Swiss-Prot record:
GO terms for cellular component: cell periphery; cytoplasm; Golgi apparatus; membrane. Residues 138-158, 257-286 have a biased composition (Polar residues). It catalyses: S-ubiquitinyl-[E2 ubiquitin-conjugating enzyme]-L-cysteine + [acceptor protein]-L-lysine = [E2 ubiquitin-conjugating enzyme]-L-cysteine + N(6)-ubiquitinyl-[acceptor protein]-L-lysine. This is E3 ubiquitin-protein ligase pub1. Its EC number is 2.3.2.26. Residues 159-176, 184-194 have a biased composition (Low complexity). Pathway: Protein modification; protein ubiquitination. SMART domains: C2, HECTc, WW. The modification Phosphothreonine is found at T156, T180. It holds the Pfam family HECT. One of its GO terms (molecular function) is phospholipid binding. CDD domains: C2_Smurf-like, HECTc, WW. It comes from Schizosaccharomyces pombe (strain 972 / ATCC 24843) (Fission yeast). The active site is at C735.
Length: 767
C-alpha cells in the first residue's frame, strides 16, 4: 500500500502568534485558532483576551498522511459571528513537507500568516509544533482517503469549543484559502466535478519540494524555485531537483541558510531540501565548525541532533544555522527590518521543558525552583496588561543573554586602575588584552584599595570610566548641540592623532559593559544607536542632533525654493576656523539645488551630517564593539531598546522633579496635578523613565538634575500644560519637554490614559 494511504497519529501544538493585525483603533482582538486537517478534523483553541500576541500552547492529536493538509486559521472571537468572522490570518502546511511520518520526529515551525480569498490585511506569525507519537500506524483505505478530501473546512460557531467536528460549509466562504486543495488521489472517474490544482501541483502531479507554479500576465506558466530563488519556463522533475540539491549541500551549505531566512513564507526552503535528499540521510548542515562545547550525534534512524555540553541540553537545530525573522513597528505594524535569529533559540540557562500527563508543555526554572506554562523565550501571557514594549524587550533580552556567544569563558580578566587616572589606565589595560581574555569573568581592582569585585566594583568602574571617556574635553565626543546633553561623535576628533585607537577602545568598553551586564552612564543621539544596528539614518534623526538645522531642511521640503535659496550640492565644514567645501556628489559645488532635486539634496546632506563625516571614527568604534558583541545578536533590539541596554534606567529624584516642573493653565494646587504626582510616587522606576522618554525624548536625566533639562531653544523645565479633551490621550512635545495633559475627572482615568500614551505609543508623532 502506498505511503500516502497510511495514516499516523501526530500531535499538533499551537504555541503562539506574534504581531497580529489590529483592526480596531481602540480595542485589541480576542484571538483564537482553528486547526483543520483535510477538511474533516477540526479543533479550536481557547480565546486569549485583548492581545496581539496570544500564547495558547494547546496540543491536539490528529490522524494524518504524508499528503494531508493542515490549515490553521486565527480569528477574533469578538467578531466571529459578524461578517468576515474577525479573520486574522491562515497558514497551510502539507505534512510531508515538514515531517517524515516513517521516521518520526519533532519540528518547531514559525510561519507568516497569509491572507484569505477576500484579500483582507494580515500581519504576524504563528508558531506551531508537530511531533509524532509512539502509537502504531493506522491503515486508511484509499477510497476513504480520497473521499475525505471532497469535504470542506468546518468551523464551529462556538470558538471556545475544543471538540472535533465535521460540518459541511460553503466553499466560497472558506477562510483557509483552499485547505482541500492538496495532494490527495484524483477524484473518482464517476465524478464530473473539474479538478482544481494548487500552485504546488499540476496535471502531471505534485511539484518537487520548494517549487511553485505561477502564471504571468500573458497566461504563460512558469516555475519558481524558492530553494535557489530562481525562475524557469521548464517544469522541474524530482530526480533533477534532488541531484541539484545534493550537489548544493556539498558545495555551499551556507547558501541554504540564507535561502531559508529570506523565504520564510515558502514553507522553509531548507526543510524542503532535506526532504528531497532524505533517502541518503543528508541534512541541511550549518557552515563552519560547531561552537565550543557542542557535539553532533545521530539517532538510530540516522537523524542528526546536537548536544550542548555547556548547558547539558540537546536540540534538533544546528547551532550554526540562522533564520531570519521580521521586526514589526511603525504605522499599521509594517515590516521595518529583517533580523537573523533562531526561531526560538535555546532555553535560558537553568530552564527545562517538560510535559504533563496530558501532553501539555510547561517549563521549570531551576534557578528559582518555580514552574510556569509560559515559554521564557516568548512574551509573558501571565498578565495581558503588561505593555507590549516590555514583553518584547524581556523576550529579546532573555534570548540575547542566553546565546553561547554571550556566555563568559572560564577564567578571570583582571583590570587594575588608579581612580585619578582611570581613562589612561583603562586604555592600557583593555587594549593590551585579547577579545577572548575580555570575555572571562571581569575582576576590577582600584589601586591602593582592598575591595573584592563581586559586582559592585565593576559597576562603579563603568560609571566612573564613562564620565571620563565621554568628556568633551578629550575631543572624542561632543554634546549633540548647545541645547542638549546627549552625546555624538566629534567629527573633528582627528586633532588627537591617536583618536581612532581611542574609538576602538570605547567600542570595546561598551561591548564589555553589555557582555558583563553592566551599564555606562551616557546616552547618545538616536542615530548613533541606529548606526550600531546598521539601520538607515533618516531626516527625523537630525532633530536630536541639531533641531534648528532639522527645521531648515523640513522648510526646504515643504516650500517652493525657486529663486529663494542659492544652494549647491555641497556643504561647508568649519574645522577649527578653516572653512572647507565638501561635495555631496561628484562636482556637487557646481550643481544647483532646484525644486526638482531638493529631495535628493536633503537626503545627501542628512547622510553627510549624521554618518559620512564621522565614518572613519565610527568604523573604529564598531571594530572594537563587534569583537565582543556579534552583530546578528545585537540586531535583535531596536534603537530605543539598545539605549536601555547600554545605559540602563537611572534613579529619579521625585523631589527634584517636582521642584523643577512648570505648569501652564494649571497650578500646583489643582487636583489633577496632585493626582499626577501621586501616580508618579506609585509608578515603578521603569515606568517613570518611560514617561520621561515619552516627554523629553530620552530616559536620561542630566547630571545636575531636572534643573538642567534642555529644549530645542535653550533651558526648558519639565512642563505640564492643560490641553486637549478629557476623552483624548495626553500628547508630548519632546522639543520643549512639555506634556499636554487634558483635565481628566478622576485619578483612575488619568492613570489609564497616561499609561496607554506612555506604554503603547510606538514611534514618533510628537511636535
Amino acid at each position: 500500500m502506498s505511503n500516502s494511504a497510511q495514516s499516523r497519529r501526530i500531535r499538533v501544538t499551537i504555541v503562539a502568534a506574534d504581531g497580529l493585525y489590529k483592526r480596531d483603533v481602540f480595542r485589541f482582538p480576542d484571538p483564537f485558532a482553528v486547526l483543520t486537517v483535510d477538511g474533516e478534523q477540526t479543533h479550536t483553541t481557547t480565546a486569549i483576551k485583548k492581545t496581539l500576541n496570544p500564547y495558547w500552547n494547546e496540543t491536539f492529536e490528529v490522524n494524518v498522511t504524508d499528503n494531508s493538509t493542515i490549515a490553521i486559521q486565527v480569528f477574533d472571537q469578538k467578531k466571529f459571528k459578524k461578517k468576515g468572522q474577525g479573520f486574522l490570518g491562515v497558514i497551510n502546511l502539507r505534512v510531508g513537507d515538514v515531517l517524515d511520518l516513517a521516521i518520526g520526529g519533532d519540528e518547531m515551525l514559525t510561519r507568516d500568516l497569509k491572507k484569505s480569498n477576500e484579500n483582507t490585511v494580515v500581519h504576524g506569525k504563528i508558531i506551531i509544533n508537530l511531533s509524532t507519537t509512539a502509537q502504531s500506524t493506522l491503515q486508511v483505505p484509499s477510497s476513504a482517503a480520497s473521499g475525505a478530501r471532497t469535504q470542506r473546512t468546518s468551523i464551529t460557531n462556538d470558538p471556545q469549543s475544543s471538540q472535533s467536528s465535521s460540518v459541511s460549509r460553503n466553499p466560497a466562504s472558506s477562510r483557509a484559502g483552499s485547505p482541500t486543495r492538496d495532494n490527495a488521489p484524483a477524484a473518482s472517474p464517476a465524478s464530473s466535478e473539474p479538478r482544481t490544482f494548487s500552485s504546488f501541483e499540476d496535471q502531471y502531479g505534485r511539484l518537487p519540494p520548494g517549487w511553485e507554479r505561477r502564471t504571468d500576465n500573458l497566461g504563460r506558466t512558469y516555475y519558481v524555485d524558492h530553494n535557489t530563488r530562481s525562475t524557469t519556463w521548464i517544469r522541474p522533475n524530482l530526480s533533477s531537483v534532488a541531484g541539484a540539491a545534493a550537489a548544493e549541500l556539498h558545495s555551499s551549505a551556507s547558501s541554504a541558510n540564507v535561502t531559508e531566512g529570506v523565504q520564510p513564507s515558502s514553507s522553509n526552503a531548507a526543510r524542503r531540501t532535506e526532504a528531497s535528499v532524505l533517502t541518503s540521510n543528508a541534512t541541511t548542515a550549518g557552515s563552519g565548525e560547531l561552537p565550543p562545547g557542542w557535539e553532533q550525534r545521530y539517532t538510530p534512524e540516522g537523524r542528526p541532533y546536537f548536544v550542548d555540553h555547556n548547558t547539558r541540553t540537546t536540540t534538533w537545530v544546528d547551532p550554526r544555522r540562522q533564520q531570519y525573522i521580521r521586526s514589526y513597528g511603525g504605522p499599521n505594524n509594517a515590516t521595518i527590518q529583517q533580523q537573523p535569529v533562531s526561531q526560538l533559540g535555546p532555553l535560558p540557562s537553568g530552564w527545562e521543558m517538560r510535559l504533563t500527563n496530558t501532553a501539555r508543555v510547561y517549563f521549570v526554572d531551576h534557578n528559582t525552583k518555580t514552574t510556569t506554562w509560559d515559554d521564557p523565550r516568548l512574551p509573558s501571557s501571565l498578565d495581558q496588561n503588561v505593555p507590549q514594549y516590555k514583553r518584547d524587550f524581556r523576550r529579546k533580552l532573555i534570548y540575547f543573554l542566553s546565546q553561547p556567544a554571550l556566555h563568559p569563558l572560564p577564567g578571570q580578566c583582571h583590570i587594575k586602575v588608579r581612580r585619578n587616572h582611570i581613562f589612561e589606565d583603562s586604555y592600557a589595560e583593555i587594549m593590551r588584552q585579547s577579545a577572548t581574555d575580555l570575555k572571562k569573568r571581569l575582576m576590577i581592582k582600584f589601586d591602593g584599595e582592598d575591595g573584592l569585585d563581586y559586582g559592585g566594583l565593576s559597576r562603579e568602574y563603568f560609571f566612573l570610566l564613562s564620565h571620563e571617556m565621554f568628556n568633551p574635553f578629550y575631543c572624542l565626543f561632543e554634546y549633540s548641540s548647545v541645547d542638549n546633553y546627549t552625546l555624538q561623535i566629534n567629527p573633528h576628533s582627528g586633532i588627537n592623532p591617536e583618536h581612532l585607537n581611542y574609538f576602538k577602545f570605547i567600542g570595546r568598553v561598551i561591548g564589555l559593559a553589555i557582555f558583563h551586564r553592566r551599564f555606562v552612564d551616557a546616552f547618545f543621539v538616536v542615530s548613533f544607536y541606529k548606526m550600531i544596528l546598521q539601520k538607515k539614518v533618516t531626516l527625523q534623526d537630525m532633530e536630536s542632533m541639531d533641531a534648528e538645522y532639522y527645521r531648515s531642511l523640513v522648510w526646504i521640503l515643504d516650500n517652493d525654493i525657486t529663486g529663494v535659496l542659492d544652494l549647491t550640492f555641497s556643504v561647508e565644514d568649519n574645522c577649527f576656523g578653516e572653512v572647507v567645501t565638501i561635495d555631496l556628489k561628484p562636482n556637487g559645488r557646481n550643481i544647483e539645488v532646484t525644486e526638482e532635486n531638493k529631495r535628493e539634496y536633503v537626503d545627501l546632506v542628512t547622510v553627510w551630517r549624521i554618518q559620512k563625516r564621522i565614518e572613519e571614527q565610527f568604523n573604529a568604534f564598531h571594530e572594537g564593539f563587534s569583537e565582543l558583541i556579534p552583530q546578528e545578536l545585537i540586531n535583535v533590539f531596536d534603537e530605543r531598546e539598545l539605549e536601555l541596554l547600554i545605559g540602563g534606567i537611572s534613579e529619579i529624584d521625585m523631589e527634584d522633579w517636582k521642584k523643577h516642573t512648570d505648569y501652564r493653565s494649571y497650578s500646583e494646587n489643582d487636583q489633577i496635578i496632585k493626582w499626577f504626582w501621586e501616580l508618579m510616587d506609585e509608578w515603578s522606576n521603569e515606568k517613570k523613565s518611560r514617561l520621561l522618554q515619552f516627554t523629553t525624548g530620552t530616559s536620561r536625566i542630566p547630571v545636575n538634575g531636572f534643573k538642567d533639562l534642555q529644549g530645542s531653544d535653550g533651558p526648558r523645565k519639565f512642563t505640564i500644560e492643560k490641553a486637549g479633551e478629557p476623552n483624548k490621550l495626553p500628547k508630548a512635545h519632546t522639543c520643549f519637554n512639555r506634556l499636554d495633559l487634558p483635565p481628566y475627572t478622576s485619578k483612575k482615568d488619568l492613570d489609564h490614559k497616561l499609561s496607554i500614551a506612555v506604554e503603547e505609543t510606538i514611534g514618533f508623532g510628537q511636535e
